[in-house]
A protein has these predicted regions:
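Hydrophobic anchor residue at the start of the ABC signature
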Residues: 1
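Conserved catalytic motifs of ABC-family nucleotide-binding domains
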Residues: 8
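Catalytic Walker B motif of ABC-type/P-loop ATPase nucleotide-binding domains
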Residues: 12-16, 21
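Helix N-cap at the start of a conserved alpha-helix in ABC-type nucleotide-binding domains
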Residues: 23-25
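ABC transporter nucleotide-binding domain
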Residues: 29-117
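C-terminal coupling/interaction segments
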Residues: 105-144
């Protein structure tokens, strides 16, 4: 990255720049990327969604070289409003739901599973809608 900056380019392309960094270094490096973006165009290729949340002003989603979306993060997330749900079930019922739906997280507590999943409509009457995040967005476009 230092070598790429030597020529003071107008466009800086970074491919997975925080992969392998510990959390403290990742945070520090995101600050550097953010500072650089004030002076030049920074293109960031990453599958680490927290990097996008921290620094992206605009997101381009690509699949096999084809642009699927190009929008501000908030606009992309708005598309998923009403499609992300939390369901609390006995731990024994978890497998059936995670097989049937795209699941972005499972938390276990007191013999129960709190499942975060994507579905265009409420998967069950007890499902509670929740705000989408970047991981949900990633799974929506690139998950199963």
């Amino acid at each position: 990255i230092a070598q790429a900056l030597l020529g003071d380019p107008e466009i800086l392309v970074l491919d997975e720049p925080t992969a392998g960094l510990d959390p403290e270094e990742r945070i520090r490096f995101r600050g550097i990327i953010s500072d650089l973006s004030q002076q030049k165009l920074v293109l960031l290729s990453t599958h680490i969604v927290s990097d996008l949340e921290a620094v992206a002003n605009e997101i381009i989603l690509l699949r096999k070289g084809v642009v699927l979306e190009m929008q501000k993060p908030a606009s992309l997330l708005e598309q998923l409003n009403g499609q992300v749900w939390l369901i609390t079930v006995p731990a024994a019922d978890e497998a059936a739901l995670t097989k049937q739906y795209t699941c972005s997280n499972v938390m276990h507590t007191d013999g129960k599973s709190v499942i975060r999943l994507l579905s265009k409509s409420a998967p069950r009457p007890d499902a509670v809608p929740t705000a989408p995040n970047m991981e949900d967005l990633y799974l929506y476009y690139f998950g199963r």
